[in-house]
Structures are given as C-alpha cells and as structure tokens.
C-alpha cells in the first residue's frame, strides 16, 4: 500500500525447489481415524512442486494440491491416533518411545474454517522433519502462489499425467472432468489431436506430451482475441511478428511509462531475441527472428509478463519505522468458526489466522470452574463452545512465526475476576512463550511521553500483550485485589445501583445474564475502577448519571466508564454496537507486568491524547464509534494514528460474523482493523488481498502523508495533494479462459477501493452467452482518470456466473499495476490461486495530468515535435495574414487558455443536466483561511459554483424519444398497409376500365372520327354523331367510376392521417409531462446533494481554521476557537439560506421553461392539423384531372405527367408508384414533425 525503499529492489524471493527426498519418495503409513483405515503408501512430490501424491489401496493415484496446504505439523503438534486398533498397528504402547517424532499431519483446505487433516507416520527415522519442512516451504512459496499463466497450465497438465489408472494410462474421463463445461468440445479437440476421445478409453502418457497438451488447449479454447492483438501490433494478416515489431510492442505497450529509463532501460534487440528463443518452438520462425501466434500467446502468459512486478510481492517496504506507521493484519474473536451467537470455538482458528498472516489475535478469557479452575476462552453469554486458554497459547506459540517473523499482538479481553487464575494466565504466557514474550520495554524505547514505538524490525520474533494495566497506586492497598468496587465506594449518583457480580461461567441462563443483555465481543468494555486505580487517569470522567436511568443501563454505563471506546453523551443510548455483556475486570500485578507497548486506555478525545503524547497507549473503537470520529474529525484521526495505535472491531449486532469495509479505516491510518476471519465476504477478501503483499508479513507501511508529522492529510480530499503523485488507470477486460465447470454465461466486475474520491463501484461487462470456456468481451475500457492516493488504492477484478455465483477474483495494488496486456490468474475467496480460471486484460497506468496541463506535458515529453508544430503553424498563418500578424495571433492563442480558463469549458447541451455532477472551483473549497468566504462576492461565487443550472428538455429532443419513435414506426406501418390495400383495388378497377375502352374501340361501335370529335358540320351524318356521343358518355362513366373509388380512398387516408397526428400529439404530451416529473424528482435530489456539498465545504473550512488556531498560544486559541464556531454557525445559516433562495429561483425558471414547452406543444397542434387537412384537400382536388389523363390521355395546362398517366402509357398499374407513394411520404413528413 505504500512505496518501497528508493532505488532498485534486490529481489529476495526464490522459486520453489523440490529436494531429492521428496521427488524420490518415502514410505509412510497413512491412517484415517474416521474411516479406521491405515495403508502403506509412498509419498512423492512432482519435480515442479505442484502436487503431493500417493497410490491408494485401489491402485489409483491420489493427489493433493500443494497450494491448498495450510500447515504441516510433527511431533506433539501432530494428531495422535485415538482408535485402539490404529494405535496398536502403529506401535503405540510398545517399546518404541519415539513414535510421536515419526508422525506428520498435513492441514489443507480452501479456507481457514473448512480444513482437512491428512495423517501420516514415517516408516524410517529422520524422514518426517525433512518432509514437513520442505512441504511447508513449497506451500508457502510466494512465487508459486503468484505463478504465471503458463505455469498454471503446466500444473493442470501435471495433474493429468499423475492421475493414471492401474495400467499407467491417462483416463479420458479425467480430461473430461477437468474441462467439464463443454464435453463435446473436449472430445472434438482430442480427436483433432489424434487422441482417444471416448470416455471409457485412456491415453498412453508418451502420446500426450506437453506439446500435444498445448495443441489440445489451442483447439479447445480458440483465441480470436490474440489474433486481434497481433493485427493491432502490425502483423497485417501474417502469422508472425518480426523482431522489431516485438521489441516495439514490449517497449510501447508493455512498458510502464513511469519507470526511470536509467534504472529500468527499454528492451534491446538482443533481449527480444532471447524472448523469441524462449517462447517460439517453430524452427523456421526462430531462424528468421520471428515469433508465431502460438509463441506470442506463450509470451503473454510467461513469467516476464506478470500484471505486478515481483518487488510488490517481496518484502520490499521499510520495516524500521514505529509500529504506528503500519497497517497490521488483525483478527476479531479469533476463536469463532461461525456466527457470534452459536457454533463451535476452535483452537485451530488461532493457528490458521496466524498462518494466514494475522499479527493481532483476540482472546476473550473467562474464569474457569472448580475443581480445575482453568481459564478458558469463549464468547460470553452466548451458546458458543469453550476452548482452554492453555491450548490456545500453545497453538499461538507453535504458529506465531511460521509465516512471518514480525511481532504478534495478543489482544486480551480479560473477564477473569480471580487473582489466582490471573496469576495462572500470566504464568502460562511466561512459560509457553518463553523468551518470545516481551515483558520489559526495550532500552531504546522506554515507556515515556514523546518516545515513539519500536519498529517491527526491533520486535522481530516477539509477542506483545494488550491487556488492561494496573498502575501502582500511592496508597498501601494490596495489589492482588481484583474485587469489584463496593457499593458504598460508588458515586452518590449511583447509590441506587446494585453491584452485580460477574458470573464465573458466561452461559445463557445464568442468573446474572439477565441483567447484562447483549454480546461480549470485547474491546476493553466495562473496565471496572477500583480504589487501586489512580484518580487522574486518561479517560476518567464524572460518574454522575441521571437518577431516573433504569437499573441495568446505569450499571452497564458505570461498568463502561473505563472502556476504550469514546463515551456517548446520551446516558440512555443502548450499547448494542459495542455488544457489551459483562465488564472486563482489572488486571492483577502479574498480568499488568506483561503489558508494555500496547496499553489500552479509554479514548476521551484526540486533543487529550495529543497532550499526553504517550505513544504506547492505544484505544479501541467499535466500528460505529470509529465512523463517528472519521466523519467528524478525519484529519485529527489521521494525526492520532501517526503516533498511537487504534483498533477497530465489528459492532455487536453483526451476529452473523459479517464484516465492515476495512478501507474506511485504513483511509485514516487505523492500524489494527480487526475482522472476522471466518467470514469470507468482500471486506475479508479485500483484507486478504491487500495483506498478500510485502512478503505476506502482516505489516504494510502506510503512505508517507499518513506518517510524517510535518504533513497534514484530509482523507476526504477531492483535489490533488501537493507532494503526492496521482495516477490514472484504464482497464479493458478482453477475454476469459476456463472460468467455470458449467456451460453458463460469465460477466466481470472491476472495482476500485481507496479514498472516497478514488473508490469506484461497479464497472461491469456484459454477460457472455452460455460460454465459460473462452468468452470474449473486448468492450470499451473502464476509466479511473484520477486516483488521488494510489498507494492506498486497490483494484479488484472479479468474475461471476450469470446467476451471481462467485467464480474468482484478484486484488491488485494500484500503485504497482503494470501497463499492457496481461493475464490475471484468479483466486478463491480465501485468496488461494485457482488453476485454470484466468482473464486477459489490457491496462494503461500512468501519472495523472490535469486537462489544462496536457499540452505542457506533451511538450515536455517531445519538445522537438512541439517546437516543430509551433513553427509549422506560424508559417501557415504567415502565408495568409503576414508574418508579424501571425506571430501576434500565435501569442494570443497561447495566452488565451491562461487568461480565460473558463472559456475553454464546453457548453453542456445535455437534455438532462440533473445527471451531471456540479463543478467545484478549486479556490473556495480548498482555502483554509478564516476570511475566504467573508466578502459577499466570494460567497455568491461559492453558491454559483455549487448550483447547477437545470433547463427543460426542448421539444425537438423529446420528438426523438423512444416512445415517439416507436409510435411513428407503428403509424408508418399502418399507412403503408392501407396504401397497399387501396392500390390493389385501384389497379384492378383501372385495368378493367382500360380493357373496356380498348374493347369498344376494337369492335368499332363507338370509334371516333375527326368529324365526330369536333363540332358536327355535316347534318346529314347523324349516325356518326350519335356514336361519338355514346363514346363520350361511356368515357365519362369510366372516369366517374374510378374517381368515386379514389375519392373514397382519399377520404379514408385523410381521416387516418388526422387520427395519427392527434395520437402523436397526445403521446408527445405524455412524454413531456413524464420528463417534467422526472426533472422535478432529480431536482429535489440535486437540491439535497448541493446542500450537503455546501455544508461539507463549510465544515472543511471550519476544521482547517481550527487546525490553524491550535498552533497558536493557548489564551489566543480559546478566543479564536469561540469566534470560529460563532462565525461558522452564522456563515452556515446565511449560505444555506442563499442556496435555498437560488434553488427556489432555479425551480421557478424550470417551471416557466416547462410551461413554455407545453404552450408550444398546444399551439402547434391546430397548425399541424390545418396544414395536413389542406394538403389532403389539394390532393383530392387533383384526382379528376389525373384520372382523365390516365384513362383518356388528356393533358391540361400546368398539369405535368402524373403517375396515373405514366401507369397508363407504360401499361403499369395506376398508383403503383405515384400518387399513393407520394401520399405515403407526405404522411411520414407530417409524423416526423411530431
């Protein structure tokens, strides 16, 4: 979480090595007490150190993933058989007294609760020690846990090669089981590689070398994403990369641009050639210095291309700073394996927590019952089981430093009200821990005011005790008394209280449990004061209480008087969050002697702690109390944690053992953020992922600004902090491989945890369609444009099945993420590596550069290019307006952004400005002077900067609303269908009429002649005139028949268009009203958000003013603090009033604008209806002329060739592409206007 030492880190991590004894194998008796079985087996480890394996009685090979091994134990820490038959077979009870030294227990499991125990007994002497130590080294190897993608694929191959049948062949069913998401694809891939693919068959190991396995994976999991990357690099259709292309790809895409080129020089051609030789197997490509697609894929999954540098995994932080400078991996109620109310307690949980890197464990100790009177550990007044204190201490002594050499803190919650048993507790600590127990403070770090705490390096291998400490009184009262204060010694305000005695056994149903409701989750709660305590101790306050407080509440408040949490001002407020069930008793001299650098005291105030300046005093906060302090005094909390330790623990109402988000309290520098290790929820996953780094030591150095006394830090800052280089990060999820054993859809979430301004949740890809083998997303990247404190930020990439089931995740420190294309091998909830599931992502990590400085940054990166560009622009301008004017214009252009920064801001014509967050100008929000808001102009600027203008959505934009688009589409379809129907009828009638005219002319009945068509001049030819008259009447009947049909159709179409127009108007009106309602709702939310932002600015200003005032002299400070508070109240009231007035005016402007939109809509409707009616009438009046032209071939002045004429002259159906289609387009134009 914080940076490493300056300079190039010398890597201390070593790859896993398997000694010859483990490779060759040793004889053991494997026994299982539950199954009453014992078998002679040969234990072996494969040469890569992936699996522990042996052959069972059924001649099938059993394997155990070494990465799942959590511990190995020998001697008295190994499990002893209890079954008489097994004991007899193993030789217990015989002459050999060294049998315990031959026992070995291997503890394995996916998490600290669900563990299994494999028991072995060596046949030969001196075998167990080697096996136990070497297996544990392999299991805890950091490089093995963070292996490359290629290594994990080789691990899957190794498992298939080990699990052979009785004939020494690889069963096909094992391959189908490993890739069970799509068995048909597996069979096809096996067949394409020339291997047996039937489930009942098997494969000879020599037919299945690693090269064939890689070919099988390529057939099984096609990689179009790799092809696309090659194309982008420049392969351009060729199946390979040249040496130059590979070198450019690594230096430009894979290289972190923040690296110093002297300490970390770019890749040279000789180094690129070595990569080709390592990953390319095709000799022809090798000879030409080329890398094939397969070789490139192997390079992407190689150890050189990890998402993190190995330095982040190694112990790379400075371990010589005081203890308060570190985040310390901490556990709450360590003994519990399930919920807080019921379930078993376990000694094993202490071992698992310590092995997992925990450096602070909790022990809730209660008084033992006669006759043994052995103190025990349990969760008081619940149904959880008990475990002996001695067993717990022995487990801690055995496991404390197996995975980390740095100090362990034992957080005692002491409920043992027996001096004898407290003395026994102290004796157990001394005898069991021996020299590891730190009793006397170090000479360099005495327990004095102003002396910092020792460092983890100073305390390596030491155990520290955190317990209530008794300070030697000035009176002569015996020190061994642990009795509770007699009633007559209590304050008079508590004279009516009954002195409830503490039960010796905290079980449900005990007589005193009724008077002490709640949970005892512990943190120095209810510490009783006796006459032996000094009268002026830190955190002591008046015992006066309201006399009408109910009896149990008053007792509980009295008991909590010396607890470490801050006392609430309301004496009637329940203490459910603290979960107090009973008071913690005072320590005897024996237990007090063991306390030194972690002395718990009740928290009173940050100011009181600063005055005392005792770094060895620490306080505990329940999460709710800590949240209050974090919200109220974040900067003071950070300052407090620079010198002293603080412990945060879950509230008592978390009876399901859920966890709070630890990032909240890391943000203010809290060191001991205690979580329930048995619950692997998101907070615990984040804790496990974060503490994986720095060599899994359990200690992470806090960022520099959280440690330096000369720097102040506001965790709620939203601007760049001077001295901290902010980062920018872009993450693109490209594809996944073998993500599930089921054929389901997969999606990926990308979250960032850090300061409030840095936290982003949740980016998410789409869900793949039933493909968990090789889903490809390749969507737009997820941007984190400004990470203010990258050393405190973590990136979480998690995959889930479409139903929400967890697949795997990875927690990455933002400050260490490499740029480029990388595989992310996923982990389970307990941060153990998964073999096959992986994601291919692309990242861009860089230093954050504000938009205003981008041009300057580019100019610094490439100054020659920048100068050339400026010269080129100057020459281009000189050609147009003359050189002197061009220079002046160029200078003006360069100065304008500095003179008018506001002019560069683009206008925001978004339809819904309520969705846009308000812009905060840097001046008023960051100023800490008391006069920053004094002038009215500045105050108005503050209101204006907070206030976002809200305008009604224009009518033109609402016409593009999806509801309107959908309605127009339906109406257009309706009109098209009506047109087609009318066209068919018109075409049929027109054809019949034209056929009738043609037939009349053919028969000669009414054949017209020139004299018949003109005025009759020959009175004698009456017959011809009669025929002409009959022909004209026939024509008129034909025309009238078609005209009546077309007019009826035109009326129907006009009615339909008018109906559509009214529908569209009504729908648009509904859209307008819905939009206005939504705007009002969002405006209300915006008002609240703006008030909160204003209050936050004013509070921050007040806190900054108070911080400045504290540095002044005492008599001036008090006066100034009073003035600051008075001014803050006045300023807050006035500012909020002005903001409310501005918001009221904005609301009125919005209402007026919305009324204008509605008025515009109402005024448009009659205009559109009249326009549409007129157009339809004009079309109807043109019908007689068009029909006569179609049937008779007449032309009229000003009448062009209509569609019916064209249809008649070309022999086509009238109306097939003319008038009706024109009406269609016109109706569509009418609808488009709405």
Curated annotation (Swiss-Prot):
Entry comment describing in which tissues the protein is expressed: Highly expressed in kidney, skeletal muscle, liver, lung, heart and brain.
The keyword Cell wall biogenesis/degradation is assigned to this record: no
Gene Ontology MF annotations: calcium ion binding; calmodulin binding; molecular adaptor activity; phosphatidylinositol-4,5-bisphosphate phospholipase C activity
Region Disordered, residue ranges: 466-588, 888-938, 1001-1026, 1207-1234
Residues annotated as domain C2: 708-836
Subunit-level organization: Interacts with SHANK2. Interacts with LPAR2.
Active site: 332, 379
Compartments in which it is found: Cytoplasm; Membrane; Nucleus
EC number per UniProt: 3.1.4.11
Reactions accelerated catalytically: a 1,2-diacyl-sn-glycero-3-phospho-(1D-myo-inositol-4,5-bisphosphate) + H2O = 1D-myo-inositol 1,4,5-trisphosphate + a 1,2-diacyl-sn-glycerol + H(+); a 1,2-diacyl-sn-glycero-3-phospho-(1D-myo-inositol) + H2O = 1D-myo-inositol 1-phosphate + a 1,2-diacyl-sn-glycerol + H(+)
Ranges where the PI-PLC X-box domain occurs: 318-468
UniProt name for this protein: 1-phosphatidylinositol 4,5-bisphosphate phosphodiesterase beta-3
PROSITE patterns xref list: C2 (PS50004), PIPLC_X_DOMAIN (PS50007), PIPLC_Y_DOMAIN (PS50008)
Gene that encodes the chain: Plcb3
Job of this protein: Catalyzes the production of the second messenger molecules diacylglycerol (DAG) and inositol 1,4,5-trisphosphate (IP3). Key transducer of G protein-coupled receptor signaling: activated by G(q)/G(11) G alpha proteins downstream of G protein-coupled receptors activation. In neutrophils, participates in a phospholipase C-activating N-formyl peptide-activated GPCR (G protein-coupled receptor) signaling pathway by promoting RASGRP4 activation by DAG, to promote neutrophil functional responses.
Region of interest called Interaction with SHANK2, as start-end residue ranges on this chain: 1231-1234
